[in-house]
Regions:
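Substrate/ligand-engaging "lid" and interaction regions
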Residues: 1-5, 11-379
């Protein structure tokens, strides 16, 4: 029996990667700290993905089990796995790394020569590489040499909107029809697993930045502008003509940065932008602006979805006014239930908008900082 472990039994884990692994013939073990969800997975041994779009459908995911990721039983699962995936949030990767390391140690002690590939499916650049660094921090030199030979950490980019919709069954999930999972082929160890829906890529960074600069950039700007105007959901926000125009323009500006950097076909990329805008309009996905906008400090950071495309566009001498409007809207994001939002607003109150933006984004270009402040103050 082929075994896969999916760290994170949340909406993305169940509604995207876990489902693809199950369809590919793996027994999928969901590892999570939420004992209630783990118990329900073990009780039902199946759940349903409700695909919500113009044409809706239901996909039943079977051959699953669950394990509490804080329990020693997890190590036994890692010992037997062929593939491990994660959907826990990039900040949690260092927390799960020791368990993965213990499993690798156990494989070495057992003399296992089976290959294991570990793919961190997170909204972050090179998340698997980050996880590898955290795992290797828990291994000695001999264990690292074993992992170098038998354990792969292919980086990937993932794209699927899975909103937190409450259903009668807590493990059922609502998902959009569209998804994309691009995985770096050269980093696999052993035979590359055959998983329908997993696209093997040789220039992964182009895919990662295409997704980051397009879906992630457009999504968060929609959320921040929508939140500023009092809208609660993404589809309500993008239906506002002014927001739609700003978001589309920002995505086209980040898109031109990609065209210049990677040689993407402009017409094809602009069609990709239109496809994503239509995904935002999907009325069947009730996606909160608070969810999409959460953690503004991370989203304003130098390598993330607002600052990175802006600075890349500037490298090529391209206009960035709509991207700067997105930054200004992020600085306006005030949500008492989001610790990063509270911290951001505290920084603004203490030091002013310009100093706060400079600190969180790493931007040193005075004109850009002043342009964002001007947009912020005009809002």
């Amino acid at each position: 029996m082929k075994k896969a472990i999916q760290f994170g039994a949340g909406n993305i884990g169940r509604g995207f990667i876990g489902g693809l692994l199950s369809k590919a013939g793996y027994h999928v073990v969901f590892a999570d700290v939420n004992q209630e969800i783990i118990d329900k997975i073990n009780e039902d041994k199946k759940y349903t993905n409700f695909v919500k779009d113009v044409e809706s459908s239901e996909i039943v995911i079977t051959d699953i089990s669950g394990v509490n990721s804080t329990k020693p039983e997890l190590i036994d699962e890692v010992k037997e796995a062929e593939i491990i995936t994660t959907a826990v949030g990039v900040r949690i990767l260092p927390i799960i790394a020791p368990s993965i390391a213990e499993g690798i140690k156990a494989r070495k002690e057992n003399g296992s020569e089976e290959y294991l590939n570990i793919i961190a499916c997170e909204n972050a650049v090179k998340a698997s590489s980050q996880l590898k660094e955290a795992v290797y921090g828990n291994l000695n030199d001999e264990e690292k040499a074993y992992a170098d030979k038998y354990v792969g950490f292919p980086d990937c980019s993932v794209d699927r909107i899975v909103p937190p919709v409450r259903l009668d069954n807590p493990i059922d999930v609502v998902v959009e029809n569209y998804y994309e999972w691009n995985v770096e082929e050269a980093s696999f160890k052993g035979a590359v697993p055959q998983i329908e829906g997993m696209n093997l890529a040789d220039n992964l960074m182009a895919y990662i930045e295409r997704k980051l600069f397009t879906l992630n950039t457009g999504h968060c700007i929609t959320a921040y502008l929508g939140n500023y105007k009092g809208f609660k959901t993404i589809d309500e926000s993008i239906a506002d003509e002014e927001i739609f125009k700003t978001v589309k323009k920002a995505m086209q500006q980040s898109g031109m940065a990609l065209v210049n950097k990677y040689g993407f076909d402009k017409d094809a990329h602009f069609k990709y932008i239109d496809k994503i805008l239509n995904r935002f309009k999907n009325p069947y996905l009730v996606d909160d602006t608070a969810r999409v906008g959460r953690e503004p400090l991370r989203k304003l950071s130098a390598t993330d979805r607002l600052t990175k495309p802006t600075m890349t566009a500037l490298e090529y001498g391209l206009p960035v006014d709509a991207l700067l409007a997105g930054m200004a809207a992020a600085l306006k994001y005030d949500n008492a239930e989001d610790p990063q939002s509270v911290e951001l607003q505290d920084k603004i109150k203490a030091n002013g908008v310009k100093a706060a933006l400079k600190e969180v984004s790493g931007i040193t270009d005075e004109k850009i900082l002043e342009d964002v402040v001007a947009i912020y103050e005009a809002m």
